[in-house]
C-alpha cells in the first residue's frame, strides 16, 4: 500500500455507483491517471467540487498494490485547488467548447496510463490559464494548443520549408500526409494551396507570436483552423468529438 501525491488537471469524470466517481487526471509526474473518488457526488461534498473538469489540483492517491497504475484503480483521497480554471471557462460557450477540445486532445495524446507527459501537462496548464483569463480569442488559443500538442508529440507541421525535401520556403502547397508545406517538386495528390495569410497565422500560433495571430482576418482564421483540424485528424487517426461544437 502506497501514497502518491501530484499536481494535475482534471480531464473528465464518470459516475460510479450511487455516490462515487472515476476521475481522469493528467498529472505532472505520473501522466494520465484514473482514480476513484468516493462520496464526491453527494450534494455537500466540497471534495467533489474540487474534482470537476478544468480544475488544477494538488491530489493524493492511495494505491493498494504499491503502484499507482496497474492493479485496479487507486483511490483519490485528498485534493486541494491550485487554480479553479473552470470558473473562467464554463460560463462562456466559446471558452467552454474550446476548453473541452483541449481536455480531449490531452487525453488522446496520453493514451498510456502512468507514463509521464510533462510537456503535454504544462501545455494544458498554460492553455487553460490563458483561456480562463480571456487573453485571446478562444478558437485561437485552441488552435495554438493543438499545434503545440502535435509538436511535443513529434508531429510538428512545417509552415515554411518543404516538409519532404527541406527546400527553403515559402512553399505553396500543403499536405497533411507529408507533414505540412511542400514544394512543387514534392507535391502529392490531395495537396491544397492555402493562403499565405493562413500559413503565417499557423506559424505564429505555433511559435507564440500573438500579435500576428490576433491581427489575422476571420476568413484566414477559419482557413487555418480547417488545416489544423485535418492535420490533427490525420495523426490521431480519428477526429475529436468536441471539435464539432467549437465556434470559429
Swiss-Prot record:
In terms of InterPro entries, this protein maps to: ARFGAP/RecO (IPR037278), DNA_rep/recomb_RecO_N (IPR022572), NA-bd_OB-fold (IPR012340), RecO (IPR003717), RecO_C (IPR042242)
Record's keyword annotation contains Cell division: no
Top-level division of the source organism's lineage: Bacteria
Q: Which PANTHER family match?
A: DNA REPAIR PROTEIN RECO
Protein task: Involved in DNA repair and RecF pathway recombination.
Q: Which family does it belong to?
A: Belongs to the RecO family.
Full protein name: DNA repair protein RecO
Amino acid at each position: 500500500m502506497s501514497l502518491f501525491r501530484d499536481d494535475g488537471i482534471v480531464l473528465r469524470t464518470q459516475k460510479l455507483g450511487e455516490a462515487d466517481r472515476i476521475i481522469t487526471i493528467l498529472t505532472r509526474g505520473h501522466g494520465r491517471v484514473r482514480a476513484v473518488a468516493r462520496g464526491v457526488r453527494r450534494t455537500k461534498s466540497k471534495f467533489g467540487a474540487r474534482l470537476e473538469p478544468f480544475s488544477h489540483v494538488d491530489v493524493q492517491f492511495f494505491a493498494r498494490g504499491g503502484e499507482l497504475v496497474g492493479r485496479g484503480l487507486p483511490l483519490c483521497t485528498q485534493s486541494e485547488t491550485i487554480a479553479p480554471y473552470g470558473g473562467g471557462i464554463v460560463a462562456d460557450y466559446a471558452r467552454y467548447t474550446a476548453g473541452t477540445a483541449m481536455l480531449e486532445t490531452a487525453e488522446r495524446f496520453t493514451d498510456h496510463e502512468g507514463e509521464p507527459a510533462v510537456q503535454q501537462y504544462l501545455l494544458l496548464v498554460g492553455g487553460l490559464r490563458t483561456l480562463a483569463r480571456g487573453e485571446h480569442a478562444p478558437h485561437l488559443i485552441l488552435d495554438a494548443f493543438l499545434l503545440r500538442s502535435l509538436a511535443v508529440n513529434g508531429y510538428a507541421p512545417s509552415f515554411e520549408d518543404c516538409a519532404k525535401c527541406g527546400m527553403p520556403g515559402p512553399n505553396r502547397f500543403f499536405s497533411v500526409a507529408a507533414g505540412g508545406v511542400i514544394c512543387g517538386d514534392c507535391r502529392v495528390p490531395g495537396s491544397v494551396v492555402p493562403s499565405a495569410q493562413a500559413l503565417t497565422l499557423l506559424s505564429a500560433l505555433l511559435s507564440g507570436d500573438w500579435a500576428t495571430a490576433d491581427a489575422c482576418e476571420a476568413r484566414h482564421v477559419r482557413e487555418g483552423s480547417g488545416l489544423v483540424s485535418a492535420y490533427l485528424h490525420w495523426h490521431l487517426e480519428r477526429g475529436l468529438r468536441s471539435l464539432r461544437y467549437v465556434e470559429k
